[in-house]
Curated annotation (Swiss-Prot):
It comes from the Eukaryota. One of its GO terms (cellular component) is mitochondrial inner membrane. Its main location: mitochondrion. This is Cytochrome b. Belongs to the cytochrome b family. Heme b b566 binds at H97, H196. One of its GO terms (biological process) is mitochondrial electron transport, ubiquinol to cytochrome c. The lineage of its organism: Eukaryota, Metazoa, Chordata, Craniata, Vertebrata. Heme b b562 binds at H83, H182. It is a multi-pass membrane protein.
Length: 379
């Protein structure tokens, strides 16, 4: 009798995706982040579901409902902080996953890469709307500032902003619709992640060398299931440590003050994972220019396959490109730092230089470095 996992229509799909999947024998721990992102998404959906059971999306009661969750609901504080810090872990895994793709040339799988860029946008939108829900000072002013950016769109800008707000300012209608979107988007993200995997399994995984691994495959289970479980355990350790020891480490103290439209906080800034894009937005004095730069800072990922000039796929054997890659990483860390600083000297000029360097590296310096390496190797 044949095994049910190989014959049953549904089990067969799971089998081909997670059990009998032929995987390269040399993929490193940098390939763990896909499964970690899946784990993060499941944690976020489950904790979010339990939070939604007690949360009320009304401007009068939103803040106090979050307080009620933390004080009165059984383990409500744990669920709330798992959800808030789970978002941070989600973005750490996302950035490392994208970085891995850039370093090892995984962007050559065009469909998988483009779905990934779409996923990044969807997760960023979800996180932004989630940040508005507790209705603290930073929630309200963050929502006001970021939605207001759409008014920079010529002709339809101001109408578009009022349409999104559902009125003439961020108010009850805005909060209610943000809650609705924040609830539905993770399920869209889950569906997109399924498509992401579908396209990945059409080609098979890339590996650190960037060479074809068809001649040397191993089954996903037990080798990579065990490896993924180790990754998940380390993720859980990091998340629980953060939640139980310093749950507010990555948050903003201003968000413990209820939203007040009459009182603007001294420094309006988003969560830490958006600071690099926020720094790029602020470094351009023109409103429309800033918005375009903000969008392009993420959208530039979509054109990276077109900028691949090297004859090798991976950066494993390309020391000059590696150097450029790590300069880019340092630049992104600098932008993240600048995004959290006030708009004054010397932070303004540092932010502008870091923003220029970001686009310069991706669009010009890295492709030129690849061409140089081709010539050095006489290819």
């Amino acid at each position: 009798m044949t095994n049910i996992r190989k014959t049953h229509p549904l089990m067969k799909i799971i089998n081909h995706s997670f059990i009998d999947l032929p995987a390269p024998s040399n993929i490193s721990s940098w390939w763990n982040f896909g499964s970690l992102l899946g784990t993060c998404l499941i944690i976020q959906i489950l904790t979010g579901l339990f939070l939604a059971m007690h949360y009320t999306s009304d401007t009068m009661t939103a803040f106090s409902s979050v307080t009620h969750i933390c004080r009165d609901v059984n383990y409500g504080w744990l669920i709330r902080y798992l959800h808030a810090n789970g978002a941070s872990m989600f973005f750490i895994c996302l950035f490392l996953h994208v970085g891995r793709g850039l370093y090892y040339g995984s962007y050559m799988y065009l469909e998988t890469w483009n779905i990934g860029v779409l996923l990044l946008f969807a997760v960023m939108a979800t996180a932004f709307m989630g940040y508005v829900l507790p209705w603290g000072q930073m929630s309200f002013w963050g929502a006001t500032v970021i939605t207001n950016l759409l008014s920079a769109i010529p002709y339809i800008g101001s109408d578009l902003v009022q349409w999104i707000w559902g009125g003439f300012s961020v108010d009850k209608a805005t909060l209610t619709r943000f809650f609705a979107f924040h609830f539905i988007l993770p399920f869209i993200v889950a569906a997109l992640a399924g498509v992401h995997l579908l396209f990945l399994h059409e080609t098979g995984s890339n590996n650190p060398s960037g060479l074809s691994s068809d001649a040397d495959k191993i089954p996903f289970h037990p080798y990579y299931t065990i490896k993924d479980i180790l990754g998940v355990l380390l993720l859980m350790l990091a998340l629980t440590s953060l939640v139980l020891f310093s749950p507010d480490l990555l948050g903003d103290p201003d968000n413990y003050t209820p939203a007040n439209p009459l009182n603007t906080p001294p420094h309006i800034k988003p969560e830490w994972y958006f600071l690099f894009a926020y720094a790029i937005l602020r470094s351009i004095p023109n409103k429309l220019g800033g918005v375009l730069a903000l969008v392009m800072s993420i959208l530039v990922l979509a054109i990276i396959p077109l900028l691949h000039t090297s004859k090798q796929r991976s950066m494993m054997f390309r020391p000059f490109s590696q150097c450029m890659f790590w300069i880019l990483v340092a630049d992104l860390i600098t932008l993240t730092w600048i995004g959290g600083q006030p708009v004054e000297h010397p932070f303004i000029i540092i932010g502008q230089l870091a923003s220029i360097l970001y686009f310069l590296l991706i669009l010009i310096l890295m492709p030129i470095t690849s061409l140089l390496e081709n010539n050095l190797l006489k290819w």
